[in-house]
């Protein structure tokens, strides 16, 4: 498992390193992660990292100006001791690395949770782009599942295209929120549903990158609270969809078409999202978050609905409870 420091390491000169490099000093190797913390190199069964901090230190002592290569389940990397950088040999992305004295008391685990794996059915995942849109083939089980939900209240023959949204960051936020709610409630499962959200084309890319934000996307009256609205039925969500003209591409990377833009069609867009509705209560226009269950500021409901006996409309106030999973284009 990776480790992190509580503070950034102070910079040291070459002479400082030479003076401190004694046989009694235990050295550790770290890389600067996306979160801004220094993480220790350690073998990890989830990502199948082939190198440890100890391995890097041995290589460094052999040749302080050399390099060492290693792999994970997805990529190959090279550590350059002269540049003090780690390079992804596939994408070219670089990270800063650092050698520093290791003390057990100075480090703690990043988190209690295991690394979150990506869904096994995702395809050609590129972690260096914000998101990917992958068109589903209409003969697949995945396509038919989405089309069937749409078809409960609308004619599925109106569907022109269904695309899977692959956003690693949003997926991780969603999974961690789900784990947090389960831990807080002390339950093995949290109430989760696939729900529809209709919108206009101008918001589609922002949602795919940043998730839903009612302050930007609008709340259509906010009758049940100031949050993001979802519907059980596609027919209801279709009221908020606007016609748009776009090209009929089959694969996109963060909104950039990989095919020629020569076929233009008029269609509307609707999201099918995975939503943690949890414990819900009847909504109210004054709510800016779910109300309390017992009057405290701690024990809150997770979402609001139009009718607790037969909910058709759901309002979510925390975007981490949402993963925008599919984009449905229809006429």
Swiss-Prot record:
Disruption phenotype: Knockout mice are viable and are born in normal Mendelian ratios. Knockout males, but not females, exhibit a striking fertility defect, with the majority of males being sterile and a minority producing infrequent and small litters. Sperm from mutant mice exhibits mild to severe teratozoospermia, with structural defects in elongating spermatid nuclear envelope and chromatin detachment associated with abnormal nuclear shaping. Its main location: nucleus. Pfam families: PARP (PF00644), WWE (PF02825). It is an enzyme of class 2 (transferase). Residues 116-331 form the PARP catalytic domain. One of its GO terms (molecular function) is NAD+-protein mono-ADP-ribosyltransferase activity. Coiled coil: none annotated. Auto-mono-ADP-ribosylated. It comes from the Eukaryota. The modification ADP-ribosyl aspartic acid is found at residue 80. The modification ADP-ribosylcysteine is found at residues 49, 65. It is found in: Nucleus, Nuclear pore complex. Predominantly expressed in testis, preferentially in postmeiotic germ cells. Also detectable in other tissues, including liver, lung, spleen, thymus and brain. Residues 15-99 form the WWE domain. Keywords: ADP-ribosylation, Differentiation, Glycosyltransferase, mRNA transport, NAD, Nuclear pore complex, Nucleotidyltransferase, Nucleus, Protein transport, Spermatogenesis, Transferase, Translocation, Transport. The modification N6-(ADP-ribosyl)lysine is found at residue 11. It catalyses: L-aspartyl-[protein] + NAD(+) = 4-O-(ADP-D-ribosyl)-L-aspartyl-[protein] + nicotinamide; L-cysteinyl-[protein] + NAD(+) = S-(ADP-D-ribosyl)-L-cysteinyl-[protein] + nicotinamide + H(+); L-glutamyl-[protein] + NAD(+) = 5-O-(ADP-D-ribosyl)-L-glutamyl-[protein] + nicotinamide; L-lysyl-[protein] + NAD(+) = N(6)-(ADP-D-ribosyl)-L-lysyl-[protein] + nicotinamide + H(+). Mono-ADP-ribosyltransferase that mediates mono-ADP-ribosylation of target proteins. Plays a role in nuclear envelope stability and nuclear remodeling during spermiogenesis. Inhibits the type I interferon activated signaling pathway. Mechanistically, mono-ADP-ribosylates beta-TrCP/BTRC to promote IFNAR1 ubiquitination and protect BTRC from ubiquitin-proteasome degradation. PANTHER family: POLY [ADP-RIBOSE] POLYMERASE, PROTEIN MONO-ADP-RIBOSYLTRANSFERASE PARP11. This is Protein mono-ADP-ribosyltransferase PARP11. It comes from Mus musculus. The lineage of its organism: Eukaryota, Metazoa, Chordata, Craniata, Vertebrata. The gene is Parp11.
């Amino acid at each position: 498992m990776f480790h992190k420091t509580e503070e950034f390491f102070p910079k040291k000169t070459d002479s400082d390193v030479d003076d401190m490099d004694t046989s009694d000093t235990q050295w550790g190797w770290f890389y600067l992660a996306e979160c801004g913390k220094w993480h220790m190199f350690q073998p990890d069964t989830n990502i199948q990292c082939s190198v440890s901090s100890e391995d890097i230190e041995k290589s460094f002592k052999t040749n302080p100006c050399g390099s060492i290569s290693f792999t994970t389940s997805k990529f190959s990397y090279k550590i350059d001791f002269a540049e003090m950088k780690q390079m992804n040999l596939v994408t070219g992305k670089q990270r800063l690395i650092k050698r520093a004295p290791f003390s057990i008391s100075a480090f703690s685990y990043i988190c209690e949770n295991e690394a979150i794996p990506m869904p096994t059915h995702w395809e050609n995942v590129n972690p260096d782009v914000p998101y990917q849109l992958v068109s589903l083939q209409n003969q697949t089980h995945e396509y038919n599942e989405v089309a069937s939900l749409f078809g409960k209240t609308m004619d599925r023959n109106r569907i022109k295209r269904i695309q899977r949204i692959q956003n690693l960051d949003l997926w991780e936020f969603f999974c961690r929120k789900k784990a947090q709610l389960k831990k807080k409630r002390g339950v093995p499962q949290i109430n989760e549903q696939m729900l529809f959200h209709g919108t206009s084309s101008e918001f589609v890319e922002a949602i795919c990158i940043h998730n839903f934000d009612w302050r930007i996307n609008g709340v259509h009256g906010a009758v049940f609270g100031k949050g993001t609205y979802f519907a059980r039925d596609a027919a209801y969500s279709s009221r908020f969809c606007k016609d748009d003209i776009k090209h009929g591409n089959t694969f996109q990377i963060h909104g950039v078409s990989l095919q020629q833009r020569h076929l233009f069609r008029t269609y509307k867009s609707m999201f099918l999202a995975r939503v943690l509705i949890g414990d819900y209560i009847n909504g109210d226009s004054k709510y800016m978050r779910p109300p309390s269950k017992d009057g405290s500021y701690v024990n809150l409901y997770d979402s609001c609905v139009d009718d607790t006996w037969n909910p058709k409309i759901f309002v979510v106030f925390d975007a981490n409870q949402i993963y925008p999973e599919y984009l449905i284009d229809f006429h």
